[in-house]
Amino acid sequence: MEQAQYNSLFSFIWNIATDVLVYAFDKSEYKKIILPMMVLRRIDVLLEPTKKQVISMKENLDKNHIDNQAPILYNVTGYPFYNTSKFTMKTLQSEIDAQRLKMNFIEYLNGYSRDVLDIVEKLHLRQVIDNLTETERLGSIIEKFTSDHINLSNKPVLDDEGNEKLPALDNHTMGTVFEELLRRFNEENNVTEAGEHFTPRDYVKLLADLAVQPIADQLQDTTYRIYDGACGTGGILTIAQERIKELGAKRGKNITISIYGQEQAPDTYATCKADLMISGEIHSFQYNEGGLQREYIAYGSTLSQDGHAGETYDFCISNPPFGTPWKEDLKKRGLKETEKAKFTDSRFTILDKDENEISFLPDISDCQMMFLANNISRMQDDTPLGTRIVEVH
Protein backbone atom coordinates (compact mmCIF):
# COMPACT_ATOMS: atom_id res chain seq x y z
CA MET A 1 0.00 0.00 0.00
CA GLU A 2 1.35 3.42 -1.00
CA GLN A 3 1.80 6.10 1.66
CA ALA A 4 -1.01 8.26 0.24
CA GLN A 5 -3.41 5.30 0.37
CA TYR A 6 -2.33 4.51 3.93
CA ASN A 7 -2.87 8.13 4.98
CA SER A 8 -6.32 8.13 3.39
CA LEU A 9 -7.34 4.94 5.20
CA PHE A 10 -6.00 6.15 8.53
CA SER A 11 -7.71 9.53 8.20
CA PHE A 12 -11.04 7.93 7.30
CA ILE A 13 -11.03 5.71 10.40
CA TRP A 14 -9.72 8.49 12.65
CA ASN A 15 -12.46 10.82 11.43
CA ILE A 16 -15.21 8.31 12.21
CA ALA A 17 -14.93 9.43 15.82
CA THR A 18 -15.36 13.12 15.02
CA ASP A 19 -18.08 12.42 12.44
CA VAL A 20 -20.18 9.99 14.49
CA LEU A 21 -19.23 10.00 18.16
CA VAL A 22 -18.71 13.72 18.78
CA TYR A 23 -21.14 15.24 21.34
CA ALA A 24 -22.56 11.81 22.17
CA PHE A 25 -19.43 10.40 23.83
CA ASP A 26 -16.51 11.72 25.81
CA LYS A 27 -13.25 11.75 23.85
CA SER A 28 -11.77 9.26 26.32
CA GLU A 29 -14.38 6.73 25.12
CA TYR A 30 -13.59 6.99 21.42
CA LYS A 31 -10.93 4.29 21.40
CA LYS A 32 -13.23 1.90 23.28
CA ILE A 33 -15.56 2.05 20.29
CA ILE A 34 -13.34 2.65 17.26
CA LEU A 35 -10.63 0.06 18.01
CA PRO A 36 -12.88 -2.95 18.69
CA MET A 37 -15.14 -2.03 15.76
CA MET A 38 -12.10 -1.87 13.49
CA VAL A 39 -10.99 -5.29 14.72
CA LEU A 40 -14.48 -6.71 14.21
CA ARG A 41 -14.73 -5.32 10.67
CA ARG A 42 -11.31 -6.71 9.72
CA ILE A 43 -12.28 -10.13 11.04
CA ASP A 44 -15.72 -9.80 9.46
CA VAL A 45 -14.37 -9.29 5.93
CA LEU A 46 -11.89 -12.14 6.36
CA LEU A 47 -14.75 -14.45 7.30
CA GLU A 48 -17.17 -13.36 4.56
CA PRO A 49 -15.97 -15.91 1.94
CA THR A 50 -16.64 -18.87 4.27
CA LYS A 51 -19.76 -17.52 6.02
CA LYS A 52 -22.20 -19.95 4.42
CA GLN A 53 -19.90 -22.93 4.97
CA VAL A 54 -19.48 -22.05 8.65
CA ILE A 55 -23.22 -21.80 9.24
CA SER A 56 -23.81 -25.06 7.37
CA MET A 57 -21.05 -26.82 9.31
CA LYS A 58 -22.37 -25.43 12.60
CA GLU A 59 -25.84 -26.82 11.86
CA ASN A 60 -24.35 -30.20 10.96
CA LEU A 61 -22.24 -30.31 14.13
CA ASP A 62 -25.23 -29.40 16.29
CA LYS A 63 -27.35 -32.02 14.55
CA ASN A 64 -24.74 -34.67 15.33
CA HIS A 65 -24.32 -33.46 18.94
CA ILE A 66 -20.61 -32.67 18.53
CA ASP A 67 -19.45 -30.48 21.42
CA ASN A 68 -15.84 -29.64 20.52
CA GLN A 69 -16.70 -27.62 17.43
CA ALA A 70 -14.00 -24.93 17.50
CA PRO A 71 -11.17 -26.87 15.78
CA ILE A 72 -13.51 -27.90 12.97
CA LEU A 73 -14.81 -24.37 12.44
CA TYR A 74 -11.27 -22.95 12.55
CA ASN A 75 -10.43 -25.37 9.76
CA VAL A 76 -13.39 -24.12 7.70
CA THR A 77 -12.40 -20.45 8.00
CA GLY A 78 -8.65 -20.98 7.83
CA TYR A 79 -8.23 -18.56 10.74
CA PRO A 80 -8.07 -18.90 14.55
CA PHE A 81 -11.55 -17.35 14.76
CA TYR A 82 -15.06 -17.72 13.34
CA ASN A 83 -18.60 -16.36 13.66
CA THR A 84 -21.65 -18.63 13.71
CA SER A 85 -24.34 -15.93 13.72
CA LYS A 86 -26.44 -15.31 10.62
CA PHE A 87 -25.24 -11.71 10.45
CA THR A 88 -22.31 -9.91 8.88
CA MET A 89 -21.63 -6.21 9.44
CA LYS A 90 -22.95 -5.56 5.93
CA THR A 91 -26.28 -7.25 6.65
CA LEU A 92 -26.55 -5.57 10.05
CA GLN A 93 -26.64 -2.11 8.53
CA SER A 94 -29.88 -2.87 6.69
CA GLU A 95 -31.81 -2.73 9.99
CA ILE A 96 -33.21 0.77 10.62
CA ASP A 97 -34.95 0.17 13.96
CA ALA A 98 -32.48 1.05 16.73
CA GLN A 99 -33.62 -1.58 19.24
CA ARG A 100 -33.74 -4.39 16.69
CA LEU A 101 -30.30 -3.35 15.45
CA LYS A 102 -29.02 -3.53 19.03
CA MET A 103 -30.40 -7.06 19.47
CA ASN A 104 -29.01 -8.16 16.10
CA PHE A 105 -25.61 -6.67 16.92
CA ILE A 106 -25.50 -8.50 20.26
CA GLU A 107 -26.42 -11.75 18.48
CA TYR A 108 -23.65 -11.02 15.97
CA LEU A 109 -21.11 -10.51 18.78
CA ASN A 110 -22.23 -13.67 20.57
CA GLY A 111 -21.58 -15.67 17.41
CA TYR A 112 -17.84 -15.08 17.59
CA SER A 113 -15.32 -17.62 18.82
CA ARG A 114 -13.77 -17.36 22.27
CA ASP A 115 -10.71 -15.25 21.48
CA VAL A 116 -12.68 -12.57 19.65
CA LEU A 117 -15.19 -12.50 22.52
CA ASP A 118 -12.28 -12.15 24.93
CA ILE A 119 -11.11 -9.05 23.06
CA VAL A 120 -14.64 -7.61 22.98
CA GLU A 121 -15.07 -8.12 26.73
CA LYS A 122 -11.66 -6.74 27.70
CA LEU A 123 -12.14 -3.65 25.50
CA HIS A 124 -15.55 -3.09 27.16
CA LEU A 125 -17.44 -2.77 23.88
CA ARG A 126 -20.63 -4.25 25.33
CA GLN A 127 -20.74 -1.50 27.97
CA VAL A 128 -21.20 1.18 25.30
CA ILE A 129 -23.78 -0.64 23.16
CA ASP A 130 -26.67 0.87 25.14
CA ASN A 131 -25.27 4.38 24.71
CA LEU A 132 -24.64 3.79 21.02
CA THR A 133 -28.24 2.66 20.69
CA GLU A 134 -29.78 5.47 22.77
CA THR A 135 -27.87 8.11 20.83
CA GLU A 136 -28.67 6.32 17.55
CA ARG A 137 -25.00 6.04 16.70
CA LEU A 138 -24.72 2.25 16.41
CA GLY A 139 -26.07 2.16 12.86
CA SER A 140 -23.85 5.07 11.84
CA ILE A 141 -20.72 3.37 13.20
CA ILE A 142 -21.52 0.15 11.35
CA GLU A 143 -22.28 2.10 8.17
CA LYS A 144 -18.93 3.89 8.36
CA PHE A 145 -16.91 0.70 8.84
CA THR A 146 -18.70 -1.01 5.94
CA SER A 147 -18.34 2.02 3.67
CA ASP A 148 -17.24 1.53 0.07
CA HIS A 149 -14.63 4.23 0.66
CA ILE A 150 -12.39 1.95 2.74
CA ASN A 151 -11.18 -1.61 2.38
CA LEU A 152 -10.18 -3.59 5.47
CA SER A 153 -9.94 -6.82 3.47
CA ASN A 154 -6.74 -8.62 2.52
CA LYS A 155 -7.96 -8.59 -1.09
CA PRO A 156 -8.22 -5.52 -3.36
CA VAL A 157 -11.55 -3.99 -4.36
CA LEU A 158 -11.99 -3.95 -8.14
CA ASP A 159 -14.22 -1.79 -10.31
CA ASP A 160 -16.50 -3.10 -13.08
CA GLU A 161 -13.59 -3.21 -15.53
CA GLY A 162 -11.45 -5.24 -13.16
CA ASN A 163 -9.16 -2.36 -12.25
CA GLU A 164 -8.04 -1.89 -8.67
CA LYS A 165 -10.30 0.59 -6.91
CA LEU A 166 -8.94 0.11 -3.39
CA PRO A 167 -5.76 -1.78 -2.48
CA ALA A 168 -5.66 -4.85 -0.28
CA LEU A 169 -4.77 -4.29 3.36
CA ASP A 170 -2.05 -6.74 4.33
CA ASN A 171 -1.63 -7.97 7.89
CA HIS A 172 1.41 -5.82 8.66
CA THR A 173 -0.24 -2.60 7.49
CA MET A 174 -3.41 -3.47 9.40
CA GLY A 175 -1.38 -3.85 12.56
CA THR A 176 0.40 -0.55 11.86
CA VAL A 177 -2.91 1.30 11.43
CA PHE A 178 -4.22 -0.21 14.66
CA GLU A 179 -1.11 0.75 16.65
CA GLU A 180 -1.07 4.27 15.21
CA LEU A 181 -4.74 4.79 16.10
CA LEU A 182 -4.11 3.59 19.64
CA ARG A 183 -1.14 5.93 20.00
CA ARG A 184 -3.09 8.91 18.65
CA PHE A 185 -6.08 8.26 20.91
CA ASN A 186 -3.81 8.13 23.94
CA GLU A 187 -2.00 11.30 22.91
CA GLU A 188 -5.27 13.15 22.31
CA ASN A 189 -6.43 12.28 25.81
CA ASN A 190 -3.08 12.80 27.54
CA VAL A 191 -2.96 9.21 28.76
CA THR A 192 -0.29 9.39 31.43
CA GLU A 193 0.30 5.67 31.55
CA ALA A 194 1.11 5.43 27.84
CA GLY A 195 4.75 4.83 28.75
CA GLU A 196 3.66 1.56 30.30
CA HIS A 197 2.02 0.49 27.04
CA PHE A 198 4.49 1.63 24.43
CA THR A 199 8.16 1.13 23.86
CA PRO A 200 9.19 3.09 20.72
CA ARG A 201 9.96 0.91 17.71
CA ASP A 202 13.56 2.13 17.53
CA TYR A 203 14.06 1.16 21.17
CA VAL A 204 12.62 -2.27 20.54
CA LYS A 205 14.89 -2.81 17.54
CA LEU A 206 17.81 -1.87 19.77
CA LEU A 207 16.66 -4.34 22.44
CA ALA A 208 16.36 -7.06 19.80
CA ASP A 209 19.79 -6.24 18.39
CA LEU A 210 21.36 -6.35 21.85
CA ALA A 211 19.85 -9.78 22.33
CA VAL A 212 20.63 -11.25 18.91
CA GLN A 213 23.56 -9.48 17.26
CA PRO A 214 26.26 -11.05 19.51
CA ILE A 215 25.10 -14.55 18.53
CA ALA A 216 23.61 -13.80 15.08
CA ASP A 217 26.20 -15.92 13.28
CA GLN A 218 25.21 -18.90 15.43
CA LEU A 219 21.50 -18.78 14.56
CA GLN A 220 20.15 -22.01 13.09
CA ASP A 221 17.23 -23.16 10.94
CA THR A 222 14.96 -23.75 13.90
CA THR A 223 12.20 -22.30 16.08
CA TYR A 224 13.14 -19.76 18.73
CA ARG A 225 10.93 -18.78 21.65
CA ILE A 226 10.58 -15.11 22.68
CA TYR A 227 9.06 -14.12 26.02
CA ASP A 228 7.91 -10.78 27.44
CA GLY A 229 6.43 -10.95 30.93
CA ALA A 230 5.26 -7.32 30.72
CA CYS A 231 4.13 -7.37 27.10
CA GLY A 232 1.71 -4.43 27.07
CA THR A 233 0.31 -4.14 23.56
CA GLY A 234 2.80 -6.70 22.27
CA GLY A 235 5.13 -4.34 20.43
CA ILE A 236 8.33 -5.85 21.80
CA LEU A 237 7.22 -9.36 20.87
CA THR A 238 6.24 -8.57 17.29
CA ILE A 239 9.13 -6.23 16.47
CA ALA A 240 11.70 -8.53 18.08
CA GLN A 241 10.19 -11.38 16.08
CA GLU A 242 10.61 -9.42 12.84
CA ARG A 243 14.16 -8.40 13.72
CA ILE A 244 15.36 -11.88 14.65
CA LYS A 245 13.90 -13.37 11.47
CA GLU A 246 15.47 -10.56 9.44
CA LEU A 247 18.91 -11.11 10.97
CA GLY A 248 18.56 -14.83 10.35
CA ALA A 249 17.47 -14.34 6.74
CA LYS A 250 20.56 -12.22 6.05
CA ARG A 251 22.58 -15.27 7.04
CA GLY A 252 20.53 -17.67 4.95
CA LYS A 253 18.60 -19.10 7.90
CA ASN A 254 14.92 -20.01 7.83
CA ILE A 255 13.83 -19.10 11.33
CA THR A 256 10.40 -19.45 12.89
CA ILE A 257 9.42 -17.69 16.08
CA SER A 258 6.96 -18.57 18.83
CA ILE A 259 5.96 -15.64 21.03
CA TYR A 260 4.82 -15.77 24.65
CA GLY A 261 3.72 -12.92 26.86
CA GLN A 262 1.63 -11.81 29.80
CA GLU A 263 -0.27 -8.62 30.61
CA GLN A 264 -2.56 -7.70 33.49
CA ALA A 265 -4.30 -4.49 32.28
CA PRO A 266 -7.49 -5.66 30.50
CA ASP A 267 -7.56 -3.05 27.74
CA THR A 268 -3.84 -3.40 27.06
CA TYR A 269 -4.10 -7.19 27.04
CA ALA A 270 -7.02 -7.03 24.62
CA THR A 271 -5.13 -4.59 22.40
CA CYS A 272 -2.15 -6.95 22.28
CA LYS A 273 -4.37 -9.90 21.42
CA ALA A 274 -6.28 -7.94 18.79
CA ASP A 275 -3.09 -6.66 17.19
CA LEU A 276 -1.68 -10.18 16.97
CA MET A 277 -4.96 -11.49 15.59
CA ILE A 278 -5.41 -8.91 12.85
CA SER A 279 -1.73 -8.78 11.91
CA GLY A 280 -1.60 -12.55 11.38
CA GLU A 281 1.37 -12.96 13.74
CA ILE A 282 -0.24 -15.84 15.59
CA HIS A 283 -2.31 -18.73 14.25
CA SER A 284 -3.58 -20.08 17.56
CA PHE A 285 -3.86 -18.44 20.96
CA GLN A 286 -3.69 -21.69 22.91
CA TYR A 287 -0.99 -24.32 23.23
CA ASN A 288 -0.49 -27.50 25.21
CA GLU A 289 2.28 -27.71 27.79
CA GLY A 290 2.60 -30.85 29.87
CA GLY A 291 -1.02 -31.74 29.28
CA LEU A 292 -2.20 -28.25 30.29
CA GLN A 293 -3.96 -25.87 27.91
CA ARG A 294 -2.25 -22.48 28.09
CA GLU A 295 -2.53 -19.09 26.40
CA TYR A 296 0.36 -17.73 24.36
CA ILE A 297 -0.63 -14.30 25.68
CA ALA A 298 -1.68 -14.88 29.28
CA TYR A 299 -3.94 -12.55 31.23
CA GLY A 300 -3.09 -11.56 34.80
CA SER A 301 -0.13 -10.43 36.87
CA THR A 302 3.11 -12.13 35.91
CA LEU A 303 4.40 -11.73 39.46
CA SER A 304 1.58 -13.51 41.29
CA GLN A 305 -0.33 -15.34 38.52
CA ASP A 306 2.36 -16.85 36.31
CA GLY A 307 0.73 -17.82 33.04
CA HIS A 308 3.79 -19.72 31.80
CA ALA A 309 4.91 -21.55 34.92
CA GLY A 310 8.03 -23.69 34.55
CA GLU A 311 8.76 -22.66 30.96
CA THR A 312 12.09 -21.47 29.55
CA TYR A 313 12.88 -19.39 26.48
CA ASP A 314 15.59 -18.46 24.02
CA PHE A 315 15.03 -14.72 24.38
CA CYS A 316 13.51 -12.76 27.26
CA ILE A 317 13.06 -9.14 26.18
CA SER A 318 10.98 -6.69 28.20
CA ASN A 319 10.42 -3.17 29.43
CA PRO A 320 8.61 -3.75 32.74
CA PRO A 321 6.75 -1.03 34.66
CA PHE A 322 8.90 1.11 36.91
CA GLY A 323 8.14 2.82 40.20
CA THR A 324 5.14 0.57 40.74
CA PRO A 325 4.75 -1.27 44.07
CA TRP A 326 3.99 -4.99 43.93
CA LYS A 327 1.89 -4.99 47.09
CA GLU A 328 -1.22 -5.93 45.07
CA ASP A 329 0.52 -9.19 44.22
CA LEU A 330 0.91 -9.86 47.93
CA LYS A 331 -2.83 -9.30 48.37
CA LYS A 332 -3.57 -11.78 45.59
CA ARG A 333 -1.65 -14.34 47.62
CA GLY A 334 -3.61 -13.38 50.76
CA LEU A 335 -0.62 -11.62 52.33
CA LYS A 336 -0.04 -8.24 53.97
CA GLU A 337 2.87 -5.92 53.18
CA THR A 338 4.54 -7.01 56.40
CA GLU A 339 4.36 -10.65 55.27
CA LYS A 340 6.61 -10.33 52.22
CA ALA A 341 8.81 -13.18 53.43
CA LYS A 342 5.84 -15.54 53.08
CA PHE A 343 5.58 -14.84 49.35
CA THR A 344 6.85 -18.19 48.12
CA ASP A 345 7.61 -18.77 44.47
CA SER A 346 10.49 -20.78 43.02
CA ARG A 347 11.12 -18.03 40.46
CA PHE A 348 12.28 -15.68 43.17
CA THR A 349 14.63 -17.95 45.12
CA ILE A 350 17.89 -19.73 44.28
CA LEU A 351 20.12 -22.16 46.12
CA ASP A 352 23.76 -21.35 46.74
CA LYS A 353 26.55 -23.93 46.58
CA ASP A 354 25.74 -25.02 50.13
CA GLU A 355 22.06 -25.51 49.28
CA ASN A 356 21.05 -22.43 51.26
CA GLU A 357 18.03 -20.60 49.89
CA ILE A 358 18.65 -17.04 48.71
CA SER A 359 15.64 -14.79 48.14
CA PHE A 360 15.38 -12.50 45.13
CA LEU A 361 12.43 -10.63 46.65
CA PRO A 362 13.17 -6.88 46.48
CA ASP A 363 11.58 -3.99 48.33
CA ILE A 364 7.81 -3.65 47.89
CA SER A 365 8.36 -0.56 45.72
CA ASP A 366 10.70 -2.32 43.27
CA CYS A 367 8.72 -4.52 40.89
CA GLN A 368 11.38 -4.18 38.17
CA MET A 369 13.69 -6.47 40.11
CA MET A 370 10.84 -8.97 40.39
CA PHE A 371 10.51 -8.99 36.61
CA LEU A 372 14.27 -9.45 36.24
CA ALA A 373 14.17 -12.41 38.65
CA ASN A 374 11.26 -13.81 36.65
CA ASN A 375 13.32 -13.58 33.46
CA ILE A 376 16.32 -15.21 35.11
CA SER A 377 14.08 -18.11 36.12
CA ARG A 378 13.30 -18.62 32.40
CA MET A 379 16.92 -19.33 31.48
CA GLN A 380 17.69 -22.64 29.82
CA ASP A 381 20.98 -24.54 29.99
CA ASP A 382 20.24 -27.40 27.62
CA THR A 383 20.70 -25.49 24.34
CA PRO A 384 23.92 -24.26 22.66
CA LEU A 385 22.94 -20.59 22.97
CA GLY A 386 21.16 -20.75 26.31
CA THR A 387 18.95 -17.74 27.02
CA ARG A 388 19.56 -14.11 26.11
CA ILE A 389 17.92 -11.55 28.45
CA VAL A 390 17.51 -7.87 27.65
CA GLU A 391 15.45 -5.81 30.10
CA VAL A 392 15.06 -2.04 30.40
CA HIS A 393 15.86 -0.62 33.85
Give names to the regions the model predicted.
Residues 4, 198, 324, 359-367:
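Short, surface-exposed alpha-helical recognition segments that flank or form part
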Residues 29-42, 207, 353-393:
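Conserved Class I SAM-dependent methyltransferase catalytic core
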Residues 1-215, 284-288, 292, 299-302:
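Non-catalytic, mostly N-terminal accessory regions of nucleic-acid modification and defense proteins
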Residues 47, 244-248, 379:
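Active-site catalytic pocket residues across diverse enzymes, especially alpha/beta-hydrolases
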Residues 18-21, 160-164, 188-194, 224-226, ...:
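Glycine- and acidic
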Residues 4, 8, 12, 38, ...:
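Generic recognition of stable, solvent-exposed alpha-helical segments in well-folded globular domains
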Residues 327-358:
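A mobile, often basic/glycine-rich helix-loop segment
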Residues 196-318, 323-328, 332-336, 393:
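Conserved S-adenosyl-L-methionine
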